[in-house]
Amino acid sequence: MNNYFSMEAFDYDDIQLVPNKAIVNSRKECVTSVKFGNRTFKIPVVPANMESVIDEKLAVWLAQNGYYYVMHRFQPEKRADFIKMMHEKGLFASISVGIKDDEYDFIDELVEKDLIPEYTTIDVAHGHSVYVIDMIKYIKEKMPDTFLTAGNVATPEAVRELENAGADATKVGVGPGKACITKLKTGFGTGGWQLAALRMCSKVARKPLIADGGIRHNGDIAKSVRFGASMVMIGSMLAGHEESPGNVIKIDGKTYKQYWGSASEVQKGAYRNVEGKQMLVPYRGSIANTLEEMKEDLQSSISYAGGRDLESIKRVDYVIVKNTIMNGDY
C-alpha cells in the first residue's frame, strides 16, 4: 500500500481551520481572485460541468461577469458552434470532451476550423486511465495553446501520470458529489474522504488541482483551498437557480428544480451503468447572489486566516474533529 494511504482519512465536516491574527480592518479588503490558466477569475469556484447545472446562457453570463465555467459535453454536436458563439461575443470558450474515438475526430474538426477553445476539460468518471492519457497527449499535440484539465482522479499516482502526460490541471474527486452514488454502486471513490484525497494529491501536484465534489457549505471552499485546490467545482449548491437548467417543480407551495448526476438514469436515458441519481433542490433565486455570498464568505475566511488573499488560507493550521453524524452523505 502506498504510504499516502496510511494518513488519516477525513472529510470537510471533520476539519476546522485555526484562526490567525487578523491584519485587515474589514473583510472587504480581502482579495478572493485566482489565476487559472491565462485568466484571473473573481473566486476559485466553478459550477460543475453537468447538464443540470450549466447551459449556454449561463456560460455566457459567467464569462461576462468574471467567473470560470466548464460547459458540459452532453450535446456534443453543439460544441463547435458554442466555441464560435463565445468567440464572436469576445468571451473565452471552455468545453468538455470524452475519450471515445469520435472525440479525436472532434479535436481534428476544431483544429481544421480554427476553433481552439481557451480551456478544455477531459471529463471522465475514472480519469486514471490509459485512454485519458492518450487523449491528453493528442489534445496537447493538436491544440497546444488550450489549457487542459483532466480527471477525475483520486490518488497522487494519478495526478503525477496525468501531469506528466501534459495535463495543465487535474480534477480530484471520484463520487463524492450529492447526486453521485458511485461509492454505493461500486465500492470505490472518495466519498467520505474527499478532503483527505485532495490533501494527498496536493503533496505531489506541480500544477493546479480542481477539487470536485462533496462541497456542502461555503466554508468548504476555504477548506479546499487550504488542502491544495486552485479551483473548487460545485454541483448541488449551484443548481436550482433562476439561471440553472432543469424544470421548476412546485410541491406543497414550495418551489424546486431538478438536479441529476452525469451518470444518472436521467442523463443516460436508460437504467444501465447508473452511478448517479436525480433529486430536487430548493429554488434559490439568482445565481449572482449565491456567487456573491460565496465571495463574501471567502473574504471572511481570508480575514480569519490572517491575510489579504487566498494564499494566507493555505498556511493556516487545522484540527481534525471527527463528526461521525455528518461525515459523508447527510
Swiss-Prot record:
Catalyzes the irreversible NADPH-dependent deamination of GMP to IMP. It functions in the conversion of nucleobase, nucleoside and nucleotide derivatives of G to A nucleotides, and in maintaining the intracellular balance of A and G nucleotides. GO terms for cellular component: cytosol; GMP reductase complex. Belongs to the IMPDH/GMPR family. GuaC type 2 subfamily. Transmembrane segments: none annotated. Pfam families: IMPDH. GO terms for biological process: purine nucleotide metabolic process. NADP(+) binds at residues 209-232. PANTHER family: GMP REDUCTASE. NCBIfam families: GMP_reduct_2 (TIGR01306), PRK05458.1 (NF003966). This is GMP reductase. Keywords: NADP, Oxidoreductase. Gene3D superfamilies: Aldolase class I. The gene is guaC. Its EC number is 1.7.1.7. It comes from Lactobacillus delbrueckii subsp. bulgaricus (strain ATCC BAA-365 / Lb-18). It catalyses: IMP + NH4(+) + NADP(+) = GMP + NADPH + 2 H(+). The active site is at 180 (thioimidate intermediate). InterPro entries: Aldolase_TIM, GMP_reductase, GuaC_type_2, IMP_DH/GMP_Rdtase_CS, IMP_DH_GMPRt. One of its GO terms (molecular function) is GMP reductase activity.
